[in-house]
A protein has these predicted regions:
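Non-catalytic surface loops within mature trypsin-like serine protease
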Residues: 83, 160, 227, 293, ...
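Conserved N-terminal segment of class I S-adenosyl-L-methionine
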Residues: 2-179, 183, 191-193, 205-208, ...
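S-adenosyl-L-methionine-dependent methyltransferase catalytic module, highlighting the catalytic core
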Residues: 201-210, 214-216, 220-370
Length: 383
């Protein structure tokens, strides 16, 4: 949806106000935004605010600085605020056919998705009425769940393939996380799940910088991602994965969806120290961290769930069943799990939470992190 509150928060993704501290202020005009955006937005003060958009018609917003026009797609439930020119590589998640192959439903998150969502809610701890920004919200499924318990969620994603339920209940924006189209301090908190691994190192830094600016000096940012490390416990997961591959070769399970989901991973975060350095360069610090050693997940979800899915897999739909249909309508046609399956998944979710309860202090690659803005931005190689 596009609420009046969202329209108060949005801004041009690429234009900065001229006013700032002595280090980031600049003459008015788009030239200073175009030529000096990166340096100014990474200023230790948090950078200038972004230029507010002006309404020119019911379905359009215009930037008074660069002149770009942005559409309000009210029928589809989102504001189209992506930069006119691409910032970097465009993920395949923005591809219509790729999204159709992934598929999704608006069923509540369960299993590892629920573990991540509940860790976000525990560590971020949004208050009643607080609006939380989902950075890389995908179809908007988690944003729907994050809006429970009195908090509200807004979502931004590079691909506008949103679930109908999310488009009706959540403020949604199509935008690039590397150039967030929001005013400074627009949201008190934000989260990013399974997103940073899809970016190269400059992209990770850009997202952290933009997130810091968007949550403001007193804000909070939760991330789930992974560094290129592993613990001794990861050997068990690798053994399960080897077994799963053999079962896949025998036609007993299907790896396609998981392979698709990870197919454009760049895995730029080399270690936890590397991530901390990127955070420091972006003006953030890691306030809390828990590791995710996926012992129970490997058995229950990576192996058991795939065996179950293969057993109940329906025959493929004929091509004419999807021809000429939008991505949103294709998503709506994906068969949701039944009540019994959901009850079993909820129960198994508690088993998967043991991975955090028992092994959350054992250093490994995947981790949950709570980040907060720090006093100043450290100079780094990307400055």
């Amino acid at each position: 949806m596009i609420s009046p509150a969202l329209l108060e928060r949005v801004a041009c993704p690429v234009c900065l106000e001229s006013a700032g501290c002595p280090q980031c202020s600049a003459p008015a005009g788009h030239a200073a935004c175009r030529d000096d955006y990166v340096r100014r937005v990474r200023c230790a003060c948090g950078g200038p605010d972004k230029v507010r958009l002006e309404a020119r018609a019911e379905a359009a917003l215009v930037c008074p600085c660069c002149g770009a026009s942005y559409a309000l797609r009210r029928h589809d439930g989102y504001a189209d605020l992506g930069p006119v020119r691409p910032v970097g590589e465009v993920t395949q998640y923005a591809d219509h056919e790729f999204q159709e192959r992934l598929g999704t439903t608006d069923a509540e998150p369960v299993l590892s998705a629920r573990v991540k969502a509940d860790m976000m809610r525990r560590m971020l701890a949004p208050g009643a009425g607080e609006v939380v920004l989902d950075l890389g919200c995908g179809a908007g499924k988690l944003a729907l769940y994050a809006g429970r318990d009195g908090a509200r969620a807004a979502g931004v994603d590079v691909a506008p393939f949103f679930l109908a339920g999310a488009a009706a209940a959540v403020d949604l924006v199509r935008g690039d996380l590397r150039r967030l189209p929001f005013r400074k301090g627009a949201f008190p908190s934000a989260y990013s799940l399974d997103v940073l691994e899809h970016l190269d190192e400059p992209g990770v830094l850009d997202v952290l910088v933009e997130a810091r600016r968007t949550v403001g000096p007193g804000g909070r940012l939760f991330v789930y991602t992974h560094a290129m490390e592993s613990s001794a416990l990861a050997r068990f997961q690798r053994a399960v994965n080897r077994l799963a591959r053999r079962l896949g070769q025998a036609g007993l399970i299907d790896h396609e969806r998981e392979a698709l989901r990870k197919s454009d991973h760049l895995n730029a975060i080399r270690s936890h120290e590397h991530f901390e350095a990127l955070c420091a360069e972006a003006g953030l610090e890691v306030a809390e961290r828990r590791y995710y050693n996926v012992v129970f997940k490997a058995v229950v979800e990576d192996l058991g769930l795939r065996l179950y899915e293969q057993a109940r897999r329906r025959k493929p739909r004929p091509p004419e069943a999807t021809e000429g249909r939008s991505a949103n309508s294709l998503r709506a046609s994906v068969k949701p799990p039944g009540a019994l399956a959901m009850a079993a998944a909820r129960a198994l979710t508690w088993v998967l939470k043991l991975d955090v309860v028992l092994f959350g202090g054992v250093r490994t690659g995947p981790f949950f992190g709570l980040l907060r803005p720090r006093g100043g931005v450290q100079e780094g190689p990307h400055a």
